[in-house]
Every structure is written in structure tokens, then in C-alpha cells.
Amino acid sequence: MVNQVLVHVKTSKGTWETTFQKSTRIKDVILGSRMHFRLAKEVKLVLCREESPHADFDPDRAFVNYNVLDGEVLILKEVVINGDMLNHSH
């Protein structure tokens, strides 16, 4: 379909091959991925391209704004906020 894009969303729990409308907002992709992988709602997640892991997508923009292509691999990653992850190893 011309208005749809097939993407591979990679997480630490595996990869999800799925199709979204090109007009889908990034935050809705993150929400769908969170539900698919059953990730805790407290965990802050961001989406980025596999080849540019430091350029996080803006959650309020859509796939079409980033020219996401069919078959593209996207990384869904957890954002660690300083102080949230305490080291309890001792």
C-alpha cells in the first residue's frame, strides 16, 4: 500500500515486523510496540533508526516526517533517567 510502511521494531525482547500508516505519529508507534512487547508503562521509550541510534524521533511527528522506508529497522530503546536506576548490587 502506498500509504503504509513496513518496519522492523527491534527491542531487547526481540523484533516486531509490523505495518503502520505513514501518517502514524511516533508516540503511537511506541505505544503499539509497548503493548506488543508488554513493556512496563513506567519505562520511558524512544524510537530511532538503527543506523542513527543517537537521533531519537520526536514523538509528536509522524513516519512521513522522517521518510521512513519499507523494510526499515527501527530501534525501540529504554531511556535511563539519572537517579531512576539505582545500583543495588552490593
Question: Where in the sequence are the language-model features?
Answer:
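Ubiquitin system architectures
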Residues: 1-90
